[in-house]
Each structure stands twice: as structure tokens, then as C-alpha cells.
Amino acid sequence: MITGIQITKAANDDLLNSFWLLDSEKGEARCIVAKAGFAEDEVVAVSKLGDIEYREVPVEVKPEVRVEGGQHLNVNVLRRETLEDAVKHPEKYPQLTIRVSGYAVRFNSLTPEQQRDVIARTFTESL
């Protein structure tokens, strides 16, 4: 459980009146704000705070969307034969547009190497 606290008494003067979030399950404390000695968002073991007295403060948690990593998907609805024919006969496909790395690009404007790469990456036999 997460508890918000304001330190009211401490051997370390840097901790006096600082605000922390205590995670009782992990035995950790996250610094919200301190005069000195601790960085904002720094996580330390509760034991590092030493002998302290504190008062609990209400904590309001707002949902936060945090995206770390993730994947990117380009969808091109085409047949392999269409792209292969566009490589051989670009004049027949002047408006053929595909998605590459999130951008729309004319297939004919790609280099031959890029065209081969798109064909190789786009079509698979199975998942």
C-alpha cells in the first residue's frame, strides 16, 4: 500500500518537512520534495530515512498513461504480385502508395533495395 507522508522530525535536517510516498510492500520510499540531499523521484529503502516521525497526508492518484517500448504496425492492403509488378513496370503504378515507418510514400520513389525490403517484410507465409 502507498502512503503519503510529511516528515515532521528527523535526525537528518534535510528530511525535515519533506514529502514522501511510502510503499509498505516493497519497503521503499519515493521522494516527492526535500530541501536537499534527496532528488525528486529518488527511491530509497525506508531504513535510509533513519529515525523519523511523520504525519500522513492524503494522496490523490490520477490515472496516467505510460507507454514504454511498444510496437509499430504498418498495414498495406496489397498483393505481393502487385508490388512485384510495380518493380518491373513502374509506369503502370504512378500512384501506388504504401506505409513505411509511419509515413505514406510512393512505392516508385523507393530505391530498388528499399522496394525489395518492403516486399520481403510485408509478405509472410504464416504468423
From Swiss-Prot:
InterPro entries in the record: Auton_GlycylRad_Cofactor, Form_AcTrfase_GR_CS, Gly_radical, Glycyl_radical_cofactor_GrcA
Record's keyword terms, sorted: Acetylation, Organic radical
Modified residues (N6-acetyllysine): 48, 88, 92
A single Gene Ontology CC term: cytosol
Domain Glycine radical: 5-127
Molecular function per GO: formate C-acetyltransferase activity
Residues with Glycine radical modification: 102
Presence of keyword Phosphoprotein: no
NCBIfam families in the record: spare_glycyl (TIGR04365)
Protein purpose: Acts as a radical domain for damaged PFL and possibly other radical proteins.
Protein name: Autonomous glycyl radical cofactor
The gene coding this protein: grcA
